Amino acid sequence: VKPTYGTVSRYGTVPVACSGETVSVMAKDAKTCRKVLDDIAGHDDKDGTSLPESEIAKKADAKEIKRIAIINDMMADVSDDVKANIDSAVAKLGVEAVNIDSSVIAASRPAWNILMSAELCNNVSRYDGVKYGHRAEKFSGIDELYTNSRTEAFGELLKTAIIFGSETLSTENYMKVYDKALRTRRVIVEEFAKIFAEFDAVMIPACSKAFYTEENVKADKYISYKENFYTAPASITGLPAVVAGGVQLIGKAFSENVLLELASKI
């Protein structure tokens, strides 16, 4: 379960994209997820974005989920197994499921990748081998220490994201790329608000395939980066989401308990 942004303190974690990342819970069943989430939720004086338990309880949405939207634009490239998982989940939940179109929600990935890379670029700047992070053994000066330490410690995917983030924040790209991504985020949030005016939750795939083999990952090392197409909507909006039975449920803010109740039935 990925809780609503602000439910759990991020203090003590390695920051990547501070405006959207959350501390989530992975467990074998919904009951355990709920128990752990109850234990870790609440305000932390060292994290200004974390909310007090009283405020979380006050904002909690406990409305029963009876009507779910399935977004067609998020189903286009998924395998037959994933489509079968969606159908199976709907049948088990016994809710009304309606297929809708929303190219806005499908635009979450490019917008989130821009924002995430830009924030990541700033957040990892501290890992220079002096005070934080890996320290290279061989260097002839401070500049070479920075270069060697980061070259040795960072993987290819991280380096790619840093370069992309740096370009995104450059003077020539800031307004036409980064600022546009911020405005796109606002539009996506508004789109979810419109959907939730008619539906109680959104159901989309968690991945394009039901499972991946080691060979799949070796053949395409960027596969996990591509799969965030399905998790980006919840990340960029800060909405809660639950993955169970190969499907993903996204709910209204602070509706984690209701989502977990559904997850226990899938």
Protein language model features and the residues they cover:
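Short helix-loop-beta junction
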Residues: 83-96
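Conserved beta-strand termini and adjacent loop/short-helix elements that scaffold enzyme active sites
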Residues: 71, 98-103, 206, 244
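Charged, often glycine-rich, active-site loop that binds/positions anionic groups
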Residues: 110-123
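Flexible loop/turn segments at secondary-structure boundaries
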Residues: 22, 76-78, 107-108, 171, ...
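Glycine-rich, small-residue loops and helix-cap segments
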Residues: 40, 92, 119, 126, ...
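Flexible, glycine/charged-enriched surface loops at secondary-structure junctions
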Residues: 46-53, 95-103
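A short helix-breaking turn/cap at a secondary-structure junction
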Residues: 2-84, 144, 148
